[in-house]
C-alpha cells in the first residue's frame, strides 16, 4: 500500500500535537511520508455487500474455494460469489440486491447441461435427463431380440401435464451394418421400450482368413454397441422421422442445444451367443443326500411343471421315502423313474380336500450300483405337476417337501414355489425419480425421501406398474433405507456414511433387479468460518443498553460514567459467521476411495440448513443474530456450536474471544451505488459450479437520479467489516455534499441510509459521510462523530448503455487509460500542496471519540488489491468511464479535497475528542498562548529600545544602547577586569543580523559557579560618532531599585563580519545580581564608567 502525502506511522501518534505547536509558534514543517507496504486488512478484504439469492431452484448452495484468489473480492464496487445448482425443475435465476436496487440473471443452459440432457427448455422442463436400461445383455440366436427401456429422470411424477414427449431412435452397429428401433416416451413416469432384432449373420463368428483356423466362440460372446438419439415426433405423435444421425456422429457434438440432442448417445454393450443356455433351474436341498430341481421361469395355466429328484453321487442311502404336498389348483401327476435299472419307485397319492399329498418310495436296485459320471448328482425320478387353476393372474403355488429314511426318521420340511403368470415377463426395472440423494437429514433432522416405482416388461414390450407386488431390501441401511411398502427410499439422519451406487434390491416372483442410488453425506466435523474471532469494544461508540445489551463488566470509577452513563455502554465488534462442509461419498470399490460432490477444493455454505441448531456455549458473552452475525456482549471466551438435531453430539464448534481491549474506528470506506448489474461465468475447474460477479453502478446518468451509499469500517486491530451487519439503531449516517451544483443530499427517509441526488454533471470526491453514535447516547450537544468517509461521485447525463457497448470492445485498454487519467488528475490536485503534512491517526493511537479537525488521509488497499480495480477501490471492468468528458472541478474546497484523493478506499477518519483530550489540549493551548504573549511582549520591548544609544563623556553618541544582563556582583566585575582579549575557546553566537551602523555580537555564557574572569571588549567602528542618539531615561544613583536584582530582555543586532563591539560575560557570583551597561551612566560604578571612557578614548 502506497500513500503520498501521508505522515509516517511513527509520526502519526504526535501528529495533532505537532500541528498545534507548528501553528502557534509559527514554525513550518516540511514532511513527506510513505506508508510502509503492509497489508492493512488482516481479515477478509472489503467488497460490495450485496445479497445473492438463487430463485427457481429446489436445492442450491453458495460455495467457498479452498484457496481463493485474494483479488476476487477486493473492491468496494463489486462482489464475486460462486454457487452450485444441485436440483432444479426449470432454469434458475440469480438475484442480487442491495437496498432498493436489484438485478436478475437467468443461468444459461450451457453452464448447467449434463451429458444426458433431454432437449431444449422451450419444449421440455429444465432438469429432465434420460436413463436407459438394457433388458437383455445376453442375446441368443434362438431369440435374437433386444429390448431397451428409457426413463426420464428428474420428472415430477405427480405433475400430469400432457407434454409432447420426444421420440427415441435406437441403433446397433456391427460390421458396417446397423439395426434400428424406436419408441416414444409417455405415461406419468415418462417410459418407453425400444425393441431391436439382431441380424442372424451377427451371431456367426468373424470371417476366417484363408490359411488360419476358425476361432472358437468366445465365452463372453460377440460385442455389439447400442446408441440412441432424441428426435421430435410428428404432428400425430408418430416416430417416423428420417435419419437423425448427422455426419455419422457417434459421440455428442457441440452444435448447440437444438442440434446436440440429435447426435448419438451411447447406451451400452450387449453380447451375442449362438448356443442357448440350458434351462435355468432352482435348487432345493432337503438334506445332504436328496436335492430337488425346479424350473425358475414362470408358468402359465395348464402347463406341466417337472421336478427333478436327484441324489448325491457320494451318498450311501439305498432307501428313502419322498413326500410332497400341494394346494388346491395343482394336480400331482405320475412319477417317472430316470434309471429303472438303478431305482425302484412306488407312488401313493392322497386327497385331503384343500391339499393333495403324494408319497414316493425309492429303493436302490443292487448293492454296488453307483453312478460314476462326473456330475455331483444323479437323477432318481421326475415328478410332474399340472397347473390347473389359480386365483390371480400372477402368483405362486407352494410345494412342501420332506424326505424320510427307514430307522432314521424324517427331515425338516422344505418349501419350493412355482411362479404362475399369464404374461411372458422379461424383466422388472426399479425406477427412482433421481439417481442421487443428498443426505441433509444429518444437518436438519428432516427425512429426505425419493419416490420409487417398479415396472415389469413383457415379451411384447408391455409395461406394467407392479410397485405394490414387489419385495425390497437395502443392502446397507447405514447408507440408505427403503420403506416397508417399497414405494420410496430415504435417509433419516441416522446414517453414518455415503456411498456411490448403493444398492436396494427389488424382487418380483422369480425376477429381481437392483436400484443404484448415490448417497452424498456432509463431511464431519463441519467447518465454522468467523470473519473475526477476537471481538473488542469500540472506543467512542456507545449504544443504548437493552435486554440483549447489558453492560459488559464493572468499570473503573473514571470509566463508569462513560460506560454506563445515560443508559449506554460501549459497542462490541461484530463478525460474520457461516458454516461450511463438503458432501462426500465412498467409492464402490474395495478400497472405498472418497469422492466429492464437486471437488476437494470447494466447500458448501450450509448455514441456512443448520441455523436452527447453532448456539453459543455462553450466550452472555456473545450472541448470534440471524445465525450469521456474531455480537460480543461481555469479556470472556465462548464457543460457537452446531448441534446434531437427532442426538447430543456436536457437529462443529469454533472458539471466539471477547477481549477487554478497546479498538477505534480508523477508516470508513464509502461507495456510491446507483444501480446493480450481474454477470455469470463458468468455473473452468468444475463445470457444475458457476461464478457470479455483482457490480455497483456509480455513475448517475440522469438529473435527479438517486443513489445510496455502501460503507465499510476498519478498526485499529486491522479487521474490516461492512456497516450493514450492525444494528441500524446504534448509529446514524449523515451525508454532506461538497459541491451542491453536482450532487445534493435530500432529506433522508431513514437516518441510517442517506441518499444522493444528481444535480449537474461533474465527478470527483464530492460526498462526505459522517458516522455518529445513536442520539440516545450523545453525552452533550456536541455530536459524537465516530468516522468520516469521502465518496467519489460521477454524474454525466446522456451516458447510456449504448455508449457502454461501443467502448466494450476495448475493455482492457479503456480500464488502463481511465485509471491513468484519474491518477493524473489526482496528482494535479495534489501538486499545489505536496509539501504540506497531512496528519492522520494510526490505528491504536486514537482515543475514544477522538475527532481530528482536519480531513484525514485515506488508506488504500495494498498494491495487489489495486490491480483488480481502481485506486479508489471501485472496479472499472463493466463501466469504462472517460473522466476527461466531465466538467472540471477547480473550485472544490481544497482542505476537503486533499484528504480524498484516493476516492472510496478505506480512509483514516476523524473522531470526536474525549473529555480528557479536550482538557489536555486546552491546557496546551493556554500554555502556548502564554508563550506567544510573552514573546510578543519581548518583541515589543526590543523594538522600543532598538535605536536607543547611550551618550558617553567625550563622545557625541553611540549607535545602540547595550542592554546587557550581568549575572554577577559589582565586586567580582571590578576584580576580574584584566586582559581585554577573549579566550581562544570562546565563540560568538549570531542571534540577529542587521545592516548599517555599529552592530554588536553578544555571547552570554551562563556558568554560575565558574571562576573565569569577566572580559569585555568594546570597539567603536569608524564614523559611528556622527549618529544621532536618543536621550536616555535617567534614574537616580541612589534609587532603591538600583540594588535589586533585575532581568531585562532586549533585542540585539548583528554587525558585519569586520570588527565590532563584543561583550563576553561570565557569571561569577550569585549574590547581588546587577544591571550592567544599561545606560553606562546610570546604575554603574564610577570606576567602570571611567574605565570605559578611557577605553573609548584610546580607540
From Swiss-Prot:
Residue positions the entry lists as glycosylated: 95, 314, 371
Positions with biased composition (Basic and acidic residues): 813-849
GO cellular component, one term: membrane
InterPro entries assigned to the protein according to its UniProt record, in alphabetical order: Ig_TMEM132_2nd, Ig_TMEM132_5th, Ig_TMEM132_6th, TMEM132, TMEM132_3rd, TMEM132_C, TMEM132_M, TMEM132_N
Originating gene: Tmem132c
Pfam families: Ig_TMEM132_2nd (PF23481), Ig_TMEM132_4th (PF16070), Ig_TMEM132_5th (PF23486), Ig_TMEM132_6th (PF23487), TMEM132_3rd (PF23039), TMEM132_C (PF15706), TMEM132_N (PF15705)
Domain of life: Eukaryota
Compartment(s) of residence: Membrane
Biased composition (Polar residues): 1008-1018
Extracellular side: 32-915
Keywords: Glycoprotein, Membrane, Signal, Transmembrane, Transmembrane helix
Signal peptide stretch: 1-31
Record protein name field: Transmembrane protein 132C
Membrane topology (Cytoplasmic): 937-1099
Annotated transmembrane regions: 916-936
Keyword Ribosomal protein applies: no
Similarity comment: Belongs to the TMEM132 family.
Membrane topology: Single-pass type I membrane protein
Region spans: Disordered: 237-260, 801-872, 1002-1045
Gene Ontology biological process terms in this record: negative regulation of phosphatase activity
